[in-house]
């Protein structure tokens, strides 16, 4: 049985429709990240599920029961919103303990649970401090601890790592999934950070303009985005999109890039004779100086070393800028200048230029 089920959920404000007929089913114990650009409706969705806002249409089912009209306090949800909403006159300890106190937990139980979640979120040293003495990151983690301390069956987290410094944010990306799974809660986790969504979610629901564009595992979304809109949201540098007009031949589809004929393999014939966008992730491009190895000519404009890889900014003969991301010693010595870029057709994506929809085979 799904712990959270949304059916045709819609919400509009005076400025226009924010959510448009959302359907989503989240299984017990699953972590689903709601990911999308700013203004997509992510926080509004959490507020509807929490009961803070009312939907204009559709239904919300929690643990198999229709909770669309249920009062917030009767939904059994742990919540951590972006604005923290901490009690200003209470210590971090008492803020975290507030839900446990409301449920009549013993003093020993309260201390044990608060100490446990505070240690996991690295805020044990500030438990005696009031919110005014906490940094934004500490406030955010205190709100997160409060959401988890009472062991709710459903947890809603609204960008809980947004105000956390870079080092701790990286650590929490690694630790949060284990923490959330240990709580046995079903989690909806809102974020604008695609890396965070991929690291934490069992699945990702990509919300664009009030609609779920794609709901799938992180790997599926990265390798097989259903549209240009989804593809652009994942990856840094982002996906290269090269306008092409593929033609069918004896060896399958081919196209012209930067004045060179490039094979697309036998699996992409659906795009023949149409204006398409060839989608190439930067890491799928191999750059070399030897024309005999195949590929299409480019000019390497800039080389940026980044840890153990280099990011190459290149320009085709048509003037389009594309990126390649490569690891290896040879890239440390690469200089700007003429080169050739090639790719494995099996890793290429094809999008209809007019609709943006992905067509044909997907990696």
Located regions from the model:
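ABC ATPase nucleotide-binding domains
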Residues: 72, 76-78, 82, 86-229
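Non-catalytic connector elements of ABC transporters
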Residues: 237-239, 249-363
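The feature captures the beta-strand-to-loop junction immediately N-terminal to the Walker
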Residues: 35-37
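Conserved coupling/switch loops of ABC nucleotide-binding domains, chiefly the family-specific signature
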Residues: 56-59, 209
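Helix-to-loop junction immediately C-terminal to a conserved catalytic motif
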Residues: 50
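Conserved structural motif at the start of ABC-family nucleotide-binding domains
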Residues: 4, 19-21
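Conserved ABC transporter NBD signature motif
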Residues: 58-66
């Amino acid at each position: 049985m799904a712990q959270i089920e949304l059916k045709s959920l819609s919400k509009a404000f005076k400025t226009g429709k924010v959510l448009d007929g959302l359907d989503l089913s989240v299984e017990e114990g699953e972590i689903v990240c709601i990911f999308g650009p700013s203004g997509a409706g992510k926080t509004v969705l959490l507020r509807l599920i929490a009961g803070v806002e009312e939907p204009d249409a559709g239904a919300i089912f929690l643990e198999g029961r229709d909770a669309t009209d249920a009062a917030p306090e009767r939904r059994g949800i742990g919540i951590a919103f972006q604005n923290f909403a901490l009690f200003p006159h209470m210590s971090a300890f008492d803020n975290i303990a507030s839900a446990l106190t409301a449920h009549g937990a013993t003093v020993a139980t309260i201390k044990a649970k608060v100490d446990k979640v505070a240690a996991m979120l690295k805020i044990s040293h500030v438990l005696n401090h009031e919110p005014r003495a906490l940094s934004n990151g500490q406030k955010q983690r205190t709100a997160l601890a409060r959401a988890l301390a009472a062991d709710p069956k459903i947890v809603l987290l609204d960008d809980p790592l947004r105000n956390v410094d870079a080092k701790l944010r990286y650590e929490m990306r690694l630790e949060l999934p284990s923490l959330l799974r240990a709580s046995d809660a079903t989690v909806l986790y809102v974020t604008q950070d695609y890396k965070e969504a991929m690291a934490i979610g069992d699945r990702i629901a990509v919300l664009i303009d009030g609609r779920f564009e794609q709901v799938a595992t992180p790997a599926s979304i990265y390798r097989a985005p259903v549209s240009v809109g989804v593809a652009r949201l994942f990856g840094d540098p982002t996906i290269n999109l090269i306008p092409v007009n593929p033609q069918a031949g004896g060896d399958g589809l081919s196209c012209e890039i930067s004045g060179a004929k490039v094979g697309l393999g036998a699996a992409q014939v659906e795009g023949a004779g149409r204006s398409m966008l060839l989608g190439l992730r930067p890491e799928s491009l191999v750059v070399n100086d030897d024309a005999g190895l195949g590929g299409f000519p480019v000019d390497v404009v800039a080389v940026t070393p980044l840890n153990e890889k280099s990011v190459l900014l290149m320009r085709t003969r048509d003037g389009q800028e594309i990126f390649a991301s490569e690891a290896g010693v040879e890239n440390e010595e690469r200089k700007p200048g003429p080169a050739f870029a090639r790719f494995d057709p099996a890793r290429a994506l094809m999008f209809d230029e007019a609709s943006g929809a992905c067509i044909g085979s997907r990696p």
